[in-house]
A protein has these predicted regions:
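Interfacial segments of alpha-helical transmembrane regions
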Residues: 22-50, 120
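Juxtamembrane/transmembrane-helix boundary motifs in multi-pass membrane proteins
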Residues: 1-2, 27-35, 39, 112, ...
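Hydrophobic alpha-helical transmembrane segments
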Residues: 16-19, 23, 125
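Alpha-helical membrane-inserting segments
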Residues: 21, 46, 50, 54, ...
Length: 166
């Protein structure tokens, strides 16, 4: 079980980023692929930066710092738990992919409206949730840290999507 938690908390983030690169390599619509990746990463980087500013100014302890009987599954920095940077970044990345691939939110008629596109976006959302859950199970974040991170990242991504869809 610890191997699965470790995989989801540490390795899966790299797999998700790699998945976007693989998508770009194999997509026939290179410009749309670059837009998807560019806007998704832009939202994720802005969300991560804003969360980091908050964490720098308002440090908060991690669960293992408060409850000494908890042992983290892997080493991590102390004093900067809220909101989770991983949840914020990958929540924004996942929602960036979803907003751009979802038929219900698509303003651009050239976007892929297939079931495959919808599933692609949902897979990224599932990946972000798995990363967040694994970070809680690894005792490096509280549920509040990751829920707020996912929601904040998703909100920033939505704002980026709306800004660039004008």
């Amino acid at each position: 079980m610890t191997n699965l938690i470790y995989f989801c908390a540490v390795i899966l983030p790299w797999v998700m980023c790699g998945g976007l690169i693989v998508y770009l390599i194999f997509t026939k619509k290179k410009i749309a692929g670059l837009r998807l990746i560019g806007l998704s990463f832009l939202g994720a980087i802005i969300a991560w930066f804003l969360a980091s500013l908050y964490k720098y100014n308002f440090p908060s302890p991690r669960p293992f710092e408060i409850m000494t009987n908890l042992k983290p599954l892997f080493t991590t920095a102390t004093g900067d738990a809220f909101p989770s940077s991983h949840a914020t970044f990958f929540g924004a990345l996942a929602m960036g992919v979803f907003w751009q691939k979802s038929p219900s939110t698509s303003l651009d008629k050239t976007r892929d409206k297939s079931l495959r596109a919808r599933i692609f976006g949902l897979i990224f959302i599932l990946g972000a949730i798995l990363i967040a859950l694994a970070r809680v199970l690894a005792n490096v974040h509280s549920p509040l840290d990751v829920v707020v991170g996912l929601l904040f990242g998703g909100l920033v991504s939505l704002l980026i999507f709306k800004l660039f869809s004008l």
